[in-house]
């Protein structure tokens, strides 16, 4: 909705939530007057991933200028329980799919232009939704964390490889929405125990997207919108030391 309000035509990817995606498309069309389409794909199947950018471009009638890699599998495992299935599901959805989409996106972005000062202006922007935990590692969610660490590396290396015509950045949310398997008490404790004593809200994630859309000189960066969760330092090895 935010992107449509800023003048973008929007392609929405979904896997199983067809009804919700269709409702969002109709809302965007009715409230903003911008074109929008919903496209189904299983991001663990590369053949479906490879077609997404082309399908979106054809449906919207032109090249795609902004790619937001937001879809993610987030399931618990640890060093003892991680197996081939959990590894593949997390790597395929959180790392392989963004790589393939990045490749497809880069192949269709219009040629670079220059501003009035003769300096190049990027014509494409990729935003990868990562996780603040790449800045604050724990032994929990092993496959997920490794996949997101890989996506952070991909963000930086693709920013190098695709410059100057495409900028690539990342956003690392903290406790924003309660997880499906998370208790209300645990979620509230997560939020209040950040450095700022508060979590983030969806509107703040959107604000970070807005900043990256406008910041023509920013690439290869990670913005943690997490209440400072990644800076948490009150651990047993520090507390009580004078």
Q: Residue ranges of each PLM-predicted region?
A:
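Canonical Rossmann dinucleotide-binding motif of NAD(H)/NADP(H)-dependent dehydrogenases/reductases
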Residues: 1-11
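The beta1-alpha1 cofactor-binding region of Rossmann-like NAD(H)/NADP(H)-dependent oxidoreductases
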Residues: 18-19, 40-53, 84, 203
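Conserved Rossmann-fold SDR core element
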Residues: 63, 152, 162-176, 218-225
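Catalytic loop of short-chain dehydrogenase/reductase
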Residues: 73, 113-163, 175-176, 229
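Substrate-binding pocket helix/loop in short-chain dehydrogenase/reductase
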Residues: 78-79, 83-91, 190
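A short, exposed helix-loop element centered on a Lys and neighboring polar residues
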Residues: 102-103, 156
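C-terminal substrate-recognition "lid" of short-chain dehydrogenase/reductases
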Residues: 201-225, 230-231
């Amino acid at each position: 909705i935010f992107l449509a309000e800023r003048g973008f035509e929007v392609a929405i990817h979904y896997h199983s939530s067809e009804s919700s995606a269709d409702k969002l498309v109709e809302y965007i069309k009715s409230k903003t007057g911008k074109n929008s389409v919903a496209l189904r794909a299983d991001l663990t199947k590369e053949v479906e991933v490879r077609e997404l950018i082309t399908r979106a471009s054809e449906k919207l009638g032109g090249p795609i200028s902004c790619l937001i890699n937001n879809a993610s599998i987030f399931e618990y495992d640890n060093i003892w329980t991680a197996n081939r299935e959990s590894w593949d599901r997390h790597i395929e959805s959180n790392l392989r799919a963004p790589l393939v989409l990045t490749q497809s996106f880069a192949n269709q972005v219009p040629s670079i232009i220059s501003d009035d000062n003769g300096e190049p202006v990027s014509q494409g922007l990729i935003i990868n939704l990562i996780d603040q935990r790449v800045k604050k590692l724990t032994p929990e969610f092993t496959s997920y964390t490794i996949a997101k660490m890989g996506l952070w590396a991909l963000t930086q290396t693709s920013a190098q490889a695709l410059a100057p015509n495409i900028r690539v950045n990342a956003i690392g949310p903290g406790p924003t929405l309660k997880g499906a398997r998370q208790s209300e008490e645990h979620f509230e404790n997560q939020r209040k125990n950040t450095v700022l004593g508060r979590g983030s809200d969806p509107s703040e994630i959107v604000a970070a997207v807005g900043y990256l859309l406008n910041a023509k000189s920013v690439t290869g960066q990670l913005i943690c919108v997490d209440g400072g969760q990644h800076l948490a330092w009150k651990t047993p090895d520090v507390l009580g030391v004078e």
